[in-house]
């Protein structure tokens, strides 16, 4: 029996979405996870007849084309070492873990999808940008071909640039979502649901992508409406108040020409 073309190692959110994308693209897949129950449940979801599950890492074939390691950042290096030398390309999916090369003669790389994943939310993987790095140019090209199997675009990014991409994503996604939590609390206190903000959020994103976020910035800080700023700060306390002050300072600085930018603290 021929070995699967792609072995996915892991059964979390990233592993799940990648496996589904490969299976949908008619790629023969194998799956391994330290949690055998999770692996079998994932295989059942995408189709038991389409995925070969390996209960033991030692049973994973060594002659597959790709080994995609989709585990937590702090588990990547240990799993690569535990897997040992294989014939195919070994690539992890982390944006913040550098390229791993534990074996002198192997082919290693990074296959980083710039997207947030949840177990219960479907993602069109063909629209997710992948950032790839190989330990040689041939491996980099192979990783681009791997993304192309399900129609995704792949861009080259070394460890430094990948870390910058990850940092940008933290600001754009994680921090923004945290602010939505604050907004949700304010709305709840006023008796309104979060979905009243949905049209605003969609239009904010549309304008940011169409015109650039600096040009699309609106609100009391952008127009330096000190009366509104003061009134709103009176309604806040603790960390939300400090965040309001800091972000207002940031917005003000972003609206100034570079030679006029100065650090003005809000009172």
Residues covered by each model-derived region:
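NAD(P)+-binding Rossmann beta1-loop-alpha1 motif at the extreme N-terminus of oxidoreductases
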Residues: 1-58
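Rossmann-like NAD(P)(H) cofactor-binding subdomain of soluble oxidoreductases
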Residues: 36-122
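Internal alpha-helical scaffold of NAD(P)-dependent oxidoreductase catalytic cores
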Residues: 18, 25, 37-45, 105-107, ...
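Amphipathic, non-transmembrane alpha-helical scaffold segments
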Residues: 68, 169-172, 176, 237, ...
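Phosphate-coordination loops involved in phosphoryl transfer and adenosine-cofactor binding
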Residues: 3, 87, 127
